[in-house]
A protein has these predicted regions:
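Short, low-complexity, charged amphipathic interaction modules
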Residues: 79-100
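Glycine/tyrosine- and acidic-biased, solvent-exposed loop/turn segments at the edges of beta-strands
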Residues: 1-80
Length: 100
């Protein structure tokens, strides 16, 4: 089990692990006004939804500290598509040569 350091400042909660904002089982920052932020290793990050949920309902999508539009975010989480050389050639419309 992970042991976090939780700091409370004027009803705002901040979770830390080894001095970095970090929490794996929920938001690492919970503001008294309702905004929540997910952090891992001091980077905004969440793989199952927005990394920031603002109290007013707006959302921001981050992976490893990089902000994405919602569409870009979900595309980043899709597994890479595996293609054969023949499939790639079919998509490109011409032959390719694999080099190493």
């Amino acid at each position: 089990m992970i042991e976090y350091t939780v700091k409370v400042d004027d009803r705002n909660y901040f979770w830390y692990l080894n001095g970095k904002r970090h929490r794996e089982d929920g938001p690492a920052i919970e503001f008294a006004g309702g905004t929540k932020e997910w952090w891992l290793n001091d980077l905004r990050h969440r793989e199952n939804g927005p990394a920031i949920e603002y109290a007013g309902g707006a959302k921001a999508w981050y992976l490893n500290g990089v902000i994405y539009s919602e569409e870009e975010y979900w595309n980043q989480l899709k597994p890479p598509k595996e293609l054969t050389v023949e499939e790639i050639e079919g998509l490109l419309g011409y032959r390719i040569k694999v080099v190493k």
